[in-house]
Amino acid sequence: MLKRIATLILTILFTQIIIAQDIVIVGQVLSAESSEPLQAASVWFKGTNLGCTTNEEGFFLLRSNTPQRTLIVSVIGYQQRQIKLDYGKDQMIRIYLKEDISILDEVIAMPKQDEAILLLKNAYKNRHSNNPENVVNISTTMNNLTAINLTNIQQKALQRKLFKDLMSGAIEQTDTTFSLPVYLNQSIYNLQINSDSTLKLLNNSKLNALNIFPAEHWQQIIAAYTPDINPYKTYSTILGHNFMSPIAPNAKLYYNLYLADSTTINGRKNFQIRFSPKHNQGLLFKGHLWIDAETYAITQSDISIPSHTSVNYLNNLHYSFTTESFGNSIFPNNEKQGIGLNINLYPSKNMQYFGALLSEERSYSNTTSTTDTLSIRIKESNIEIPIDDKLEATWNKIDSLNQTRIQQFSAWLVDIILNQYLHIWKVDVGPVLNLFHFNQLEGASPRLTIRSGESFSPNFTVGGYYGYGFKDQYYNNTLISNGLHSYGGNIQWRFGPTRRNILSITYDHKTERVGHDDSDIYAESRVNDIEHIGNAWVMLYRPVSVHMRGRIAAQYQYEKPGFKFKINAFTQNIYANRFIPLIHKGAEVPYYSHIGLRTDFRLSWQQSSLDYFFHRIYLASKYPVVHLTAEGGYIKIPASSANEPYHSLFGKFGIYAQQHTALGFGKIHWMLQANAVVGNAPFPALVMARTSRTSYRHDTDFMLLGSMELMSNYYAALTLRYQTRGYIFGYIPYVKKFGIREDLIFNIGYGYLSDKYTTDNILALPANLYNINQGWNKTPYIECGFGFSNIFKLGDIAFVWRLTHRNSTNPEAQNFAVKWRIGIDF
């Protein structure tokens, strides 16, 4: 979700920023001898400071808002050239440079590749002992500087009336474009790293950011999406993608590797290994490493990505570090990384897009060994290390931007998108998507929902809703009401030092989809009901099974990083309707009563979340998220003219796990679910396979099953999607630049329905349930398919076939379908 938010913020702020109509010079610099492109050549207009460097393919682009006469091109090893320009005209030129014979004798000859491979093998073999992440018994001072800037903003765009007030916070660059500082944080820590723990004490800090998010949310988002680059690891994860290290066991299959140089670093001999990708399809680095000749530790690095790297919105990346030795250990003394993003839904090298630059620098000082880890502890110093005064101007620029109208509008709009509430004085109206409902039972149903806002009380809220469905209600073919009323209320209170505890009391009288009581597990960050205005068109396309319920619930919730616990006690009545009748021993009953207690344990690893007003948004994690649920229930079916009241007990248990992570050069998305219902439960409490209601798909749903087609009291399911890096489209000329990826899809579900549920001794199964003959008990349901994702970086399409139970009589069942989805991904 934060991927969508980040793109949204940039778009909101600068939707109308376009390329200025300046004088533009586009060209390519080549070697006169070999016609190969020359990278990193300096190109500038004579007599000005307007310049740039060529990219990996030798291309450059220069702009000037005044006409220029002469262009100068220079690169080490070649003779400098001056190019006469057509005064005042845009030009596309090709420039050839001759080698400078006078320095050819200084060029270092590169020995065989085998020597580089041997060094890298030894570096990999010793990776655990040399990895700075594994160094213990040291103390150090870390100075961390992180900045985010919006980049490549044209002057003429800032002169427009809508964006004119942004000039107060703009910073002019050497290429005549402007940047806008978004976030700046300098923090100084005292660290002590022991074998069993790391002590981290904040010495001094200063942070400023656009008020689109609270400061702590900025820090969490940046921490979640900052690249984790470590050449000692086989893969480094960048924006959810795995990039292979040049010291990985199979690196020689993907990299060109050369032993380029040797020198002395920290008094020890080191060898320089240069590396570059062998082909354009993999996620690989280029650059060089310095490796210690004795310990095979990496003492210095300079790493970047090739220009052809196919990761959405990733324009460039650079990472470097240097080290110092103390005793037998090597530890960094400086780390730098920068990641450049741009908004380029359509690939074009000649089109310049605004983007963002995230830069981070960490410097370490006063690093010493500690011998007694039990007695030595960091103590807070009375003398704070000062913050860099040179950054004061940037902090002031951010303050200026926070006063602009466009920033204030952007903050308001982002808040509505994330939390879906309109703040009116001390009252919140929303969620916005809940203001209108539509389903086959209610028909069109406008709804008013309000609550007390955070400005009324930061730790308490009370609210309610009322809705009216315009569809007449019938029971046994008799009109019982004109329309259907929905209403309810909620009281919530959060308490404790960190507000991790929440108590709530809720009353609901509303329609709900049958069999989707686990929706809060699969859509944890959602604030709206499952039947809302955004899904209204779905009901027009394909009706789903819903029933009315009246429910009173009391819930306690506790949450801390990595762990969440909920316990919910409730009593409810589930009402029959003309679509889903309730039949007990041959007689229809108007409702049944259900008293229950449900617990949910949520486990996660290295996952952050944004804590809003009684709403939490979970950020992406490469590790699984697991839910363990248990429920005990008592039901009562009222007496009818033919039957006495019926009472029973049942238990329901579940495990849910899902993960979205990089695997090799691709990505894998999987969901595992297993449930068991014991005792005697009414059919709405059984387990129903999640189904896709329309041609729009979700990774956690079966795509071809009909509503309530697979219902059981013992159930297991696995949905799996693997996304490649473009093994087919990545090799097709002209098409590969669009970054289309291939998807492989496999979904399997098995449900066992016990004999006792095939009769009406509890409640008769509805007629549209097609497992009533227990046909699913012997054969699992399987569907598979393939698809294409990252289409225009906005969505994907999938072709899916049903492999088993192809003769289903469910009118909603499909043996083949084309599914689609819209989503922003890196």
What are these language model-derived features?
Residues T237-F243, A248, S369-F826:
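Exposed, low-structure sequence patches enriched in small/polar residues
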Residues I25-S31, G58, I95:
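A short, amphipathic beta-strand motif
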Residues I23-I25, A32-G47, T66:
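Short, ordered, surface-exposed loop/turn motifs in non-cytosolic proteins
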Residues I101, M110-N270, S276-L284, K349-H437, ...:
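Structured extracytoplasmic
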Residues F45-K46, I72-I83:
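A short, solvent-exposed loop/turn motif at the edges and junctions
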Residues M1-Q28, V43, L104, G666-A674, ...:
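Bacterial Sec-dependent N-terminal signal peptides
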Residues D86-P111:
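Extracellular beta-sheet/turn segments enriched in Thr/Pro/Gly and aliphatic residues
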Residues T48-F59:
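Short, acidic Ser/Thr/Gly-rich low-complexity loop/linker segments typical of extracellular
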